[in-house]
Amino acid sequence: MASQLQVFSPPSVSSSAFCSAKKLKIEPSGWDVSGQSSNDKYYTHSKTLPATQGQANSSHQVANFNIPAYDQGLLLPAPAVEHIVVTAADSSGSAATSTFQSSQTLTHRSNVSLLEPYQKCGLKRKSEEVDSNGSVQIIEEHPPLMLQNRTVVGAAATTTTVTTKSSSSSGEGDYQLVQHEILCSMTNSYEVLEFLGRGTFGQVAKCWKRSTKEIVAIKILKNHPSYARQGQIEVSILSRLSSENADEYNFVRSYECFQHKNHTCLVFEMLEQNLYDFLKQNKFSPLPLKYIRPILQQVATALMKLKSLGLIHADLKPENIMLVDPVRQPYRVKVIDFGSASHVSKAVCSTYLQSRYYRAPEIILGLPFCEAIDMWSLGCVIAELFLGWPLYPGASEYDQIRYISQTQGLPAEYLLSAGTKTTRFFNRDPNLGYPLWRLKTPEEHELETGIKSKEARKYIFNCLDDMAQVNMSTDLEGTDMLAEKADRREYIDLLKKMLTIDADKRITPLKTLNHQFVTMTHLLDFPHSNHVKSCFQNMEICKRRVHMYDTVSQIKSPFTTHVAPNTSTNLTMSFSNQLNTVHNQASVLASSSTAAAATLSLANSDVSLLNYQSALYPSSAAPVPGVAQQGVSLQPGTTQICTQTDPFQQTFIVCPPAFQTGLQATTKHSGFPVRMDNAVPIVPQAPAAQPLQIQSGVLTQGSCTPLMVATLHPQVATITPQYAVPFTLSCAAGRPALVEQTAAVLQAWPGGTQQILLPSTWQQLPGVALHNSVQPTAMIPEAMGSGQQLADWRNAHSHGNQYSTIMQQPSLLTNHVTLATAQPLNVGVAHVVRQQQSSSLPSKKNKQSAPVSSKSSLDVLPSQVYSLVGSSPLRTTSSYNSLVPVQDQHQPIIIPDTPSPPVSVITIRSDTDEEEDNKYKPSSSGLKPRSNVISYVTVNDSPDSDSSLSSPYSTDTLSALRGNSGSVLEGPGRVVADGTGTRTIIVPPLKTQLGDCTVATQASGLLSNKTKPVASVSGQSSGCCITPTGYRAQRGGTSAAQPLNLSQNQQSSAAPTSQERSSNPAPRRQQAFVAPLSQAPYTFQHGSPLHSTGHPHLAPAPAHLPSQAHLYTYAAPTSAAALGSTSSIAHLFSPQGSSRHAAAYTTHPSTLVHQVPVSVGPSLLTSASVAPAQYQHQFATQSYIGSSRGSTIYTGYPLSPTKISQYSYL
């Protein structure tokens, strides 16, 4: 048998190797060390020395070193043995011996080296609790031979790493594994090559797949009844994950599940080494932050995917994070071992959930828990990587909560009171009137339980902030040292958010990925630092790539799983993993269980279209109706269009949930499953014509959910990395929808831009087809004279529900593709500014001023503004809409050409509401009701102020509200609007430097006698704009804040929401588009339609659309030379006639923004007070199409094609 040593707190990070032993039942220690000694001995336990600050006495000296008592290292409690000689090595490499004559002996870990080569094995980790009656650690004998650099399987959390030719059964259901044995499934056979490890689940073997000659890892579960149920859960979770892209979301890829001699066998990809073995190989040295960051980013991505699926990993630790290929892909990791995973709705609190060192406080205290426990574990993991030693290495749960409490403070009283296991570790103080909890002393806990408290920490911190002072690198200087200190500050900030004791306040995976430590925005202040450059280079591994051999492997090896583990010795069933096999070939993207369903077939290697089932919508084996209807054929583009700067691209697809559930109507709270996948590198040659078939018939369900495919353009070179934020629109009829970010965030530095947008309401169309041909197109010249009546041209298309003209949209597709204007893809070349919906009231007399103050950090103005405020086809012909005479329009824009960035104002007159006699005046409003309403945004060019109220324009604008003349601004850039129903939008200037983005809006609303709310009802507005400096909203007076969410910060990437309720089903015109084209101040030629006499293009025309279009904006790609300015991207979700909106912004180095309004039916975004029957499913009957980059006007209807040689989408 092997002798046992117990490690309690080695004080340094740089020396000895430890060996590992298999634990069978009893675990009285926190860390144990066992060597293959010829003299087999058992060592019993004795009391541990208390932690003091004094020096150890002479009997505690090792190699002439005096050690503080809290640095106790190796405890040898062996009263039956008088002398134990341990060979130690000093710093110079010479050996020295020291005789331990006390059972309470300490040794300095940095000077201890177990020199025998066969003792270099892994340190034991704990997953079970301490047996209070056990005083002996049972150790299993293992042959001495160890391979230090051997491979470790990625399929299991191996707790022992001894390599043997065969393994014997432990008597608890382990399979008798023999080398070169053949394991057979129904489709494949595997030859056992090597035994890799053993755990509580069973064992792992390295095997050779005979059909494909691949090396795989097979996890052989025990056939013990206690493992049967959990094995079934693991198989079901792996089956669910098999439909996801394992490379994108960084979890181990599972190939097959089968039964072999009543043992469940799981086949996984072979991975190299787990993080714990990696640390051990490097002598538990601390890992630099530049290496911790990519690991954190990849694991957080995996956790976000699990969270979106409603899954909890529940056993995240360094052993379960595997390095894929340390040589070829440094710090590329994947998450393994879903043996403890469960669904959130089925989570049951268990004493043994999570490994103890990484166990969340809610598990220890017996509180309800969710997927937030994985974020706690991840925080402990990155702390261990940073320190080289576990942050909280508790030998028992009491020690664990004691360590946490000593460093982070006691849990809140309401948590302790609600915990079912609180009384095990805490006592109420009877001396205080208020019932406060007090942590039991180690003596009290030992007296009650018989479990001795131990000190196993290497570092004892009074607070987590003290971690920033340890292990500071000495080889950094100058800007490198400043960058390292800044990096540590952000790391500690993120760590504290991950280790928040209250799970409800703990940071989520999505916010983790948007934290500055991950996005590295704080490092942009040190552009010339080599340290910073290496940090960015290390994050390159986070760029998700799909390799050809991965695709081939998946084609040859479909996932299979068993149905009933105990019914047959070899029973297999196919998973559905066809989704990962379509990267470079024309294949049908359909689940094997839904083979008859409609498919998305992709032949072009530029884009990957993937479909998967949401956690809320399980897969259905029933065929989807309508699959035989017409399809949409998208042809690949030309050589010029396919050539892009970065060969790696990410693609979003938002698939309708009903499409995956057999188009069954549902009233459940639903969401869009979001799928992201990579494409293979682009070749400059023009590919062969391979159509993309999209069956439009599958989108004929009742709820009009849009099918959207889009790829965001990344930053170039050393510019800040961007993260695209996919989202889920959770909605149900009769309830206001919430924008919920549930899908994965694009990892850093995705390249290339591709866009495909497919409209939602296909059932409205008699026949929809995209062909590679040129259809008759309604065209308008790029330049129009000032006297030409734009409204007359527009009115030709403003009547009728369907339009016969065909709109050519090469700006969305690579070749000439035509779309019927009955289902257009609305595109706008603009920097989006969404006006406040103050016109949603049917009466313009009870409108009130809604001041909005916004400070932007962007101060470079485009030279031209293309403005279209058209409501003609997007408005409903009703009693609330009337044609405004052209001659009544005011001059909307006066922007002087000044050197400093002025305020750009677009004023839209709205005089279309009917008068009503009964008015409702809220008493909370401090402003007098006026006959005209002014909604505006003031943009300040100063990026340094923290308060948007410090804008130099705020005083003028607030004073303008109190007047009755309707003046919007006083001073430079003044715009006077002397009328009623005025809506003003200030277009923020652009600036490429970083800074704070503060959006503050104030709006006060009045309700008519029909109780139709205005733009913002007090108390119903909330907003969020996540930027590197956070979101700040100032609420002025008694008005409710309504963020306009105009964020131009380069690093902001989120899906902010602002929710308001409205009962007005009639839509209003809510769009204004401004396209920044260069870095010069705004100038308008008086010959342009913006200054045409009477401004005919501002005249609204009646339309036949009761639903407001929703805007999705994405940046168009441009070459590096064409990047004149950095534009901002906004996602504006404008519900039907309501003022509720949500916006997300991501900055891209592109000068073109495409905006696509998509109509959304009541099942997606409905108002709480409007019945679903009041909504009709109609798609936008007209579209906004951006003209070419050099165009002098902005037009909102079918135009001539843009210069497709500049922009590519496929």
Swiss-Prot record:
SMART domains: S_TKc (SM00220). Residues 835-856, 909-974, 1046-1069, 1084-1103 are annotated as: Disordered. There is a cross-link at residues 25, 1203 (Glycyl lysine isopeptide (Lys-Gly) (interchain with G-Cter in SUMO)). It comes from the Eukaryota. A motif (Nuclear localization signal 1 (NLS1)) lies at residues 844-847. Residues 891-998 are annotated as: Required for localization to nuclear speckles. ATP binds at residues 196-204, 219. The keyword Cytoplasm applies. There is a cross-link at residues 25, 120, 124, 991 (Glycyl lysine isopeptide (Lys-Gly) (interchain with G-Cter in SUMO2)). Residues 885-1093 are annotated as: Interaction with TP53. Its EC number is 2.7.11.1. Residues 902-926 are annotated as: SUMO interaction motifs (SIM). Signal peptide: none annotated. Interacts with Nkx1-2, Nkx2-5, MYB, PARK7, DAXX and p53/TP53. Part of a cytoplasmic complex made of HIPK1, DAB2IP and MAP3K5 in response to TNF. This complex formation promotes MAP3K5-JNK activation and subsequent apoptosis. This is Homeodomain-interacting protein kinase 1. It comes from Homo sapiens (Human). The gene is HIPK1.
